[in-house]
A protein has these predicted regions:
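C-terminal substrate-binding/cap subdomain adjacent to the FAD-binding core in PCMH-type
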Residues: 1-144
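Conserved glycine-rich FAD pyrophosphate-binding loop
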Residues: 119-257
Length: 257
């Protein structure tokens, strides 16, 4: 079933050796547009993204980039990353992507504008070409391009993402994807102690953190994946079921598994 395929895809080669793969391929969307809401602080931005996701407008992307600010050792400049003609205002970006047929997209954007009550908000709409450029930059993490700092990937319940940011005291360069459930973060001169502190905060809020890129300042971290003890025990039992002799990449994801 799908649960098994998801489990194997996320196991980094620690559970099975795959000899044959079947892909289900879907047609690419005919067109796409992106509704940008400017100059929102993190709390109202995440609230708007949550409303958009729970609506009937079938959105396919929801991300938030905070406004330019001073972050130690990081360049926090979204205007430099997103130089697009259709962006009419500066400041933070709250982006919602809609895909499908042209008529359907235009109608759903109109619906969203009404449902989110955006009549008095500063907004922009990216056409298909600029929309694709925008989301490719999001996907390729161009916000962190040329960075020599550590890059962390944090998955957290959407309801907890704002609390986590406040606990981190805005000391890091970051943006949110998945409507607030996925946080990408750049950390300057990250030490083992700092990383451990971030781990504890993330786990406290029901999430997990992965070290995607090490810096020269912290070239090695023993555990790049972080989960709470309950999930660790589940992962350990799964490992025993699939690979009881621990032949396949032992210790790659978690020490002792």
């Amino acid at each position: 079933g799908y649960d098994l395929s998801k489990l194997i895809c996320g196991s980094y080669g620690t559970l099975v050796a795959i000899t044959e793969i079947t892909f289900k391929v879907l047609p690419a969307p005919e067109e796409s547009k992106t509704l940008i809401i400017h100059n929102q602080k993190i709390e109202p931005a995440i609230f708007l993204l949550g409303q958009a996701i729970s609506s009937s407008n079938d959105i396919s992307g929801a991300t938030f980039f905070p406004a330019k600010s001073k972050v130690p050792g990081c360049e926090m400049d979204i205007e430099k990353t997103f130089k697009l003609n259709d962006l009419k205002h500066e400041g933070s970006l709250t982006a919602i992507r809609i895909e499908g047929s042209k008529n359907s997209i235009d109608q759903r954007i109109e619906n969203l504008m009404n449902e989110l009550k955006l009549i008095n908000f500063n907004t922009s709409i990216l056409d298909i070409y600029q929309s694709e450029i925008f989301w490719n930059k999001v996907k390729n993490l161009e916000f962190f391009s040329s960075s020599k700092n550590s890059i962390l990937r944090i998955v957290i319940p959407t309801s907890e993402c704002v609390h986590l940011i406040y606990q981190l005291s805005n000391k890091f360069k970051y943006f949110f994807d998945w409507g607030g459930a996925l946080m990408w973060m750049e950390a300057f001169e990250l030490t083992e102690e700092m990383f451990d502190s971030i781990r504890k905060k993330v786990v406290k809020h029901g999430g997990y953190v992965t070290m995607i890129k090490n810096s020269d300042y912290l070239p090695y971290v023993e555990d790049v994946f972080t989960i709470n003890r309950d999930r660790f025990n589940i992962s350990q039992n799964i490992k025993k079921s699939f690979d009881s002799k621990r032949i396949l990449n032992p210790g790659k994801m978690y020490t002792g598994i």
